[in-house]
């Protein structure tokens, strides 16, 4: 699924003046990508996702989607709020009602998606009320992924998760993307997520698009600008930049900027 935004604009009513809208945003989102969206609170990140999904109606500009709006899945900031007080099976399979599948087909889909999100199929008839916060997020994610979206939008879905919980969530997303050849956009305030999981990154400020590039170029060219926006660089990138300031021949990194890759480059340089 490809999405094209041209001069997109949206402004909130005056009584919601604590929210920043979107102003003249143009960008292309290609298929089969992992894209991070970053920016300080109120920069327009969530508004952008809601406009793409159709939860907000654009006021100016164009949104062109190569597909159906129903093929876009959406995970809110606190995914556990997306589930019902019912059994896990009923919650996950709720959206399948409109597809008119038979019981066997529904069960097959539910069991497959449970395996993907790491939940035991023996828990199908357990109540969602008795689940932990992490389990509720998995159920919410399963309920969206079972509809087989072409594109998944995640509005700070990792908020409140510890490092282990975050890694588990991204593993699910990466496995889903690889198996289904799909795309996902995720909002994050943690720049480590950008270096570890994103193929592209969108930087927003005050409702405007500042950069749309790959993580390697972003950290190489715009580190100072990111810090001026209050975005804390990943520790490995910060260390790398400080090291480069002391070297006569600065090290350049292109492509993979995951922490282990950067440390390997530094280690080879020091030898």
Swiss-Prot record:
CDD domains from the UniProt entry: ABC_cobalt_CbiO_domain1 (cd03225)
The enzyme's E.C. designation: 7.-.-.-
Record keyword Kinase present: no
Subcellular location: Cell inner membrane
Record protein name field: Energy-coupling factor transporter ATP-binding protein EcfA2
Ranges where the ABC transporter domain occurs: 3-231
This protein's encoding gene: ecfA2
GO CC annotation terms, alphabetical: ATP-binding cassette (ABC) transporter complex
GO function terms (MF aspect): ATP binding; ATP hydrolysis activity; ATPase-coupled transmembrane transporter activity
Binding site for ATP: 39-46
Organism taxonomic ancestry: Bacteria, Fusobacteriati, Fusobacteriota, Fusobacteriia, Fusobacteriales
Primary location group: membrane
Pfam families noted in UniProt: ABC_tran
Function as written in the Swiss-Prot or TrEMBL entry: ATP-binding (A) component of a common energy-coupling factor (ECF) ABC-transporter complex. Unlike classic ABC transporters this ECF transporter provides the energy necessary to transport a number of different substrates.
Top EC class of this enzyme: translocase
Keywords noted in UniProt: ATP-binding, Cell inner membrane, Cell membrane, Membrane, Nucleotide-binding, Translocase, Transport
Family: Belongs to the ABC transporter superfamily. Energy-coupling factor EcfA family.
